């Protein structure tokens, strides 16, 4: 078995398992978004926490920040190719939650 330092599951979990991180990825999977839009969709997240999560995801190359030369300045966040590769994980979690964690019947999606 691989050590935690070389285990790909452990390394991925270190990146995406922080509180709010997968929800930021989930929302950005729908398309680029401004900070205030993310803050509204992630009910309960503080601006500081959102800023920290976005910065950490940027440092990992999962999210990119686009600044537009406008007045007032406009900034949008989007998933990179590396971030898009995490979308199937989010979708799998959605299916799992629908099947095992809710009272509603799960939608059967062929693998």
Explain the meaning of each model-derived region:
Residues 17, 69-93:
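Basic, amphipathic "hinge/linker" alpha-helix immediately C-terminal to the N-terminal HTH DNA-binding motif
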Residues 2-52, 69-70, 76, 107:
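N-terminal helix-turn-helix DNA-binding core of bacterial DNA-binding proteins
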Residues 85-111:
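Amphipathic alpha-helical dimerization/coiled-coil segments
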Residues 11-12, 82, 96:
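Residues within well-formed alpha-helices
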Residues 61:
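Glycine-centered, phosphate/nucleic-acid-interacting loop/turn motifs that mediate DNA/RNA or nucleotide
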Residues 65:
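Short beta-strand "wing" residues that participate in macromolecule-binding interfaces
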């Amino acid at each position: 078995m691989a050590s935690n330092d070389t285990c790909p599951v452990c390394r991925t979990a270190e990146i995406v398992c922080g509180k709010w991180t997968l929800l930021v990825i989930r929302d950005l999977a729908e398309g680029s978004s401004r900070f205030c839009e993310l803050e509204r969709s992630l009910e309960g997240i503080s601006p500081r926490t959102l800023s920290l999560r976005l910065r950490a995801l940027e440092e990992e190359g999962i999210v990119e920040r686009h600044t537009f030369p406008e007045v007032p300045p406009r900034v949008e966040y989007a998933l990179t190719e590396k971030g898009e590769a995490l979308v199937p994980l989010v979708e799998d979690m959605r299916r799992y939650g629908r099947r095992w964690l809710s009272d509603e019947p799960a939608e059967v999606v062929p693998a």
